[in-house]
Amino acid sequence: MIRRIDMALHVQEICALNDIKVRYQSMDEIEPRYWANPNKREIQIRPTKNTGYYVSALHEIGHIIGDNQDLDRLGQELWAWIYARQTALVWTPTAERIMQDSMKSYDWQERDKNVWRLYSETMV
């Protein structure tokens, strides 16, 4: 079983190894506001208190060091999630739901879903 501390340390290690500055959003703020600035090699995430926050942090890291970040916005989002899936120590139904909800907000299409499915099948 992966513990919260393992997930938090994993995010910190990736950021340290890749010279990514991390800003932590206050937990007092109700609405999560994650973002990545590849030019500044900086991300904003919530403290890694659960799997959802963990995979969201990995997704933001994916915008900086993941593949295909030169695509259109939808492609960038998809490939940042692929990076998160590839890198995660654990991928749970919660992680999958968060990814699906995020991609729905970008109106992903069947071709994008097929890329995700193909990729996910290789991770099993």
Question: What feature does the model see in each segment?
Answer:
Residues 1-6, 84:
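A short, highly charged nucleic-acid-interacting micro-segment common to nuclease
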Residues 6, 14, 48-49, 89-124:
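Long, well-structured alpha-helical subdomains associated
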Residues 12-44, 51:
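Catalytic zinc-binding patch centered on the HExxH motif and its immediate surroundings
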Residues 52, 56, 74-75:
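Short, conserved micro-motifs enriched in small and acidic residues
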Residues 55-68:
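Active-site recognition of the HExxH zinc-binding catalytic motif
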Residues 70-72:
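Short, structured beta-strand-loop surface elements
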Residues 74-89:
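An active-site-proximal "capping" alpha-helix that borders the catalytic cofactor pocket
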